[in-house]
């Protein structure tokens, strides 16, 4: 029987989890290193499990058997089907797993599940929209260096290029 509902937000910088009981009452929160699938499926599982363990430990609770847990995860890189499949094959025993992109779960969180749009600019960048008719569209999110306009890496490269051009006298300061 599923006793715990675990929500995972997994990206290129870190992993955050929330654990609730079956009624949806928040019990604990935890965090760990990155769980973007592009940084390795094994590493993603390692950090997700570490964040879950940290959450349970933060409230003085022992870690239950994974078969008592259902996990819903918004993960960066989930659209890469071979990585997604490998992630699912490596399931350590969760009773259920639901996977979505971290962009879509961020959109759902930002708008309470209602139609809307959002742009995330952090380690990576992506835009996502959910229309009133249920259709969704993602823009960007292809990863560094070709599809990450607005990300930290993209902005940093542009800033360094401008600074060097300014030092050469080819750009204004």
Which sequence ranges carry the predicted segments?
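Short glycine-rich anion-binding loops that position phosphate/pyrophosphate groups of nucleotides
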Residues: 13, 76-78, 123-126
């Amino acid at each position: 029987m599923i006793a715990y509902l675990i929500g995972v937000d997994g990206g290129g910088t870190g992993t955050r989890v929330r654990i609730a009981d079956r009624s949806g009452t928040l019990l604990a929160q935890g965090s760990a290193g990155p769980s973007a699938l592009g940084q390795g499926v094994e590493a993603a599982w390692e950090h997700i499990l570490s964040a879950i363990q940290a959450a349970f430990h933060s409230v003085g609770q022992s870690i239950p058997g994974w078969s008592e847990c259902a996990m819903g995860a918004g993960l960066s890189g989930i659209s890469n089907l071979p990585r997604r499949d490998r992630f699912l094959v490596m399931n350590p025993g969760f009773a259920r797993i639901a996977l979505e992109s971290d962009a879509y779960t961020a959109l759902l969180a930002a708008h309470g599940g209602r139609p809307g749009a959002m742009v995330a600019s952090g380690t990576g960048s992506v835009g996502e929209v959910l229309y009133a008719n249920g259709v969704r569209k993602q823009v960007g999110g292809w990863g560094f260096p070709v599809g990450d306009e607005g990300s930290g890496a993209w902005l940093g490269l542009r800033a360094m290029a401008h600074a060097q051009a300014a030092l050469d006298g080819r750009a204004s300061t």
